[in-house]
């Protein structure tokens, strides 16, 4: 697709599916191959009864990729897409991993106590530390902590539900980020997902590494 092939959706419909995720899913399935904007997603995600706009629509969008296996592309994937533009090129879904398990209530309380009721995500020596009920300064919306397998679910879906050492507390944004780091089909690092998530300089650094590795020049 080049910039002249971009076809924008003119979908201004409201959607009445039960959940935010289902409403966003319906929007994309009704507009396959068309560019959908942030405002269209928010409109579709809005509760049809109360008119309330969801804070966490972006997380539900990411879950359509990671949990349901849809291909939804953004500017990180295609240069012709501007920020806040998305496209679902087809409705084919990748296979899902085995059903997830959750820690027991007692185990989860121990995890939260260890974490001081804050997100335990660590990256480049930086600790997230967002507390339940905070407003996420990057992703927006109210922080809700949920349990995450220390070992990726795709590698060991039968994590011990009674062992707090096997679990960590993550905010919604970092739950999605971790899912993007791992390929649920084979339990290996999702290199493409990581490259999509990094900034332009890091993409160029990766390109330079590969060019040097293969003895090529720009």
From Swiss-Prot:
Reaction equations catalysed: Endonucleolytic cleavage of DNA to give specific double-stranded fragments with terminal 5'-phosphates
Superkingdom: Bacteria
E.C. no: 3.1.21.4
Signal peptide bounds: none
UniProt entry tagged with the keyword Lyase: no
GO BP term, pick one: DNA restriction-modification system
UniProt-recorded Gene Ontology molecular function terms: type II site-specific deoxyribonuclease activity
Alphabetical keyword list: Endonuclease, Hydrolase, Nuclease, Restriction system
S-S bonds: none
Protein name: Type II restriction enzyme KpnI
Organism listed in the record: Klebsiella pneumoniae
Encoding gene, per UniProt annotation: kpnIR
